[in-house]
A protein has these predicted regions:
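Conserved alpha-helical scaffold segments that buttress catalytic/binding sites
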Residues: 4-256
């Protein structure tokens, strides 16, 4: 299950020392840029590496292992014309499959078996972009390694437009739609998208922090019962309560 939480610790009492859930994590850069029109998002991974992020995480007792970058496929305009309104769709599909393969490999490679609990546990994977078109491949790769998957989508935007209703044609506003099973009747068939298999039910997703949705996104989120918490909910309830309710929505088996 994908978990997006603010701190890598077990809950603690006031006088207890925090217990780390993990002592190492893999870091993967995905310098995508073509999912949207602004130049510069590709610089994200390198800027993070040049910052003190690795040092700050190490001070918390977690070693970040740099696994390099997934180099995006960037075809020419002649090789990659608009299809169904999507810009750079062939570059996107080829990049998505590269990302998924790399993420799946890292997840499986880092899985360690705990003989005491008879459970397998993977080191977390910290992925830095890049524009948000990369999210299709990151989730698809996780799903290939761990099919029992839930997603907390922490974002101001839904990113669940489909090619047939997107006003801009920019794929960074569509990455989730390619993976949600209930939306596949809105996804046009393209041969190079065959490897992008829908891996999420609507009930596997919860949004946190929404504040700016397109009309079709609002319709699909409500129609398919996707759990969501707006920024107003975060301000009113507090982030801890929102995260607990979001986790309960996607995985009722969790106990707090």
């Amino acid at each position: 299950m994908l978990k997006s939480v603010a701190t890598p610790y077990y809950p603690i009492q006031d006088n207890e020392k925090p217990k780390l859930l993990y002592t190492s994590a893999n870091f993967l850069g995905i310098p995508t840029n073509r999912g949207q029109p602004k130049i510069g998002t590709y610089q994200g991974p390198e800027l993070i590496r040049k910052s003190n992020f690795f040092q700050l995480v190490a001070e918390d007792g977690i070693q970040l292992i740099d696994c390099g970058d997934v180099t995006p496929v960037e075809l020419s305009e002649t090789e990659d014309p608009q299809r169904f309104g999507m810009k750079w769709s062939r570059s996107f599909s080829l990049t998505t499959l590269k990302i998924a393969e790399r993420v799946e490999g890292l997840m499986k490679q880092s899985t360690k078996h705990n003989t005491e609990s008879n459970e397998s546990k993977s080191s977390p994977l910290v992925i830095v972009g890049g524009d948000h078109s990369m999210a299709t491949g990151t989730i698809l790769g996780h799903a290939k390694a761990k099919p029992d998957l839930c997603v907390l989508w922490i974002d101001a935007h839904g990113d669940i437009n489909t090619p047939l209703n997107s006003a801009s044609g920019n794929i960074h506003g569509m990455p989730l739609s390619f993976l949600v099973k209930e939306l596949q009747d809105q996804i046009p068939w393209l041969d190079d998208f065959e490897g992008i298999k829908p891996c999420l039910n609507a009930s596997n997703i919860a949004y946190i922090g929404l504040r700016d949705l397109d009309a079709y996104e609002t319709h699909d989120i409500r129609k398919h019962g996707i759990a969501y918490f707006t920024m107003l909910d975060v301000d009113r309830m507090g982030i801890e309560a929102v995260i607990k309710e979001a986790l309960q929505a996607v995985n009722p088996r969790l106990l707090f």
